């Protein structure tokens, strides 16, 4: 899929490579979108990937002295979901991150990547647009700051130049008088692209009069848009039922939806009104936290990010040498597979066929493995990420030669039919039990949102999870 894979050890090195390769190179962090685009042949002419995941301190969420929140380019969606700062001072962003994909995807996918992919249905763009975010772009020639509202030029198009990378996402933290909410309408409750999404933020005075309002809409125009007519109308108003109704109607003025396989334009337009009203009603009722759990299930383990290569005494890996990795506590040195996904590397080069390929696009979870402690979809991970990493596959799930307690529960409850999806369910479940030894039904459901079974109807699988959770 690529000819060269650079795992850089300094930011300067990444920028120099971008300057040299330009249109032929792409920055890799989570790679969850890019891998699929390369597999499908959507991205043409890309010869080199520049992996920045080993650079230190780019995965931080910080609050500066002026009250601004900063996200580094390696901050993942699950980091935002779990961050007390984001939950307390940027709740709509935490809610949007929770809606992205499944836990295995959120452990890899970055907020920066979601912004750069630039789909009008990408969840995190909408709240960041409402939060008045600014992105900082850097190259060998210097850096510049661009308001997120000016970052997009069309569907999947941005002002990012071929030699630039996004180095920072910044926005003002919400103040105590400000309340906000993100709502996503999709065809399923997980692993689904938005039909419509909305982020609403209102600043209320002591009389509950709106001092200012910000409303952003996703999946209803070529880019994420602000509902300026509704924002202007709400300013100075008290949030009565009639005001909420009119705000929903005015929000429709900003929407220019299309017909597609997920919904006709008329439905989308009507749902803009309804979802905007729902968000405003929840804010009025003090229920803006919505469905975001108090303790979200992450499947992230104890070390979700790889150690910098500099700690191993090694410089950049160009992807044309060997991959040295530890799989199931056994060290491997493998001279092949650098141009593959981790899934195919494990099956074809490491000789471990237990990890299955069900969809090769991050939908089914059959390929779930642990990479540096976190559950990931191995079909969406470049194989060179295994270099100096710790990997656990289904073959390594047994504890001291005895089946894992979830494996034993699957046998006891007859939770296997064709068995093709079983390795993925077991890996997700084992990480759940590590993170939450006695999960409830809702937590079990959260853990397997990224795993599909086409045989059992899930009842036996859920019974096995519940049995294991009681042991």
Predicted feature locations:
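Short, contiguous acidic and Ser/Thr-rich linear segments
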Residues: 330-338
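Short, glycine-/polar-rich solvent-exposed loops and beta-turns at beta-strand/coil boundaries
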Residues: 358-363
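Glycine-biased, low-complexity coil/linker segments
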Residues: 312-315
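C-terminal structural segment of proteins
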Residues: 1-306, 317-326, 331, 350, ...
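Ferredoxin-type iron-sulfur electron-transfer modules in oxidoreductases and energy-metabolism complexes
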Residues: 94, 245, 337-353, 380-471
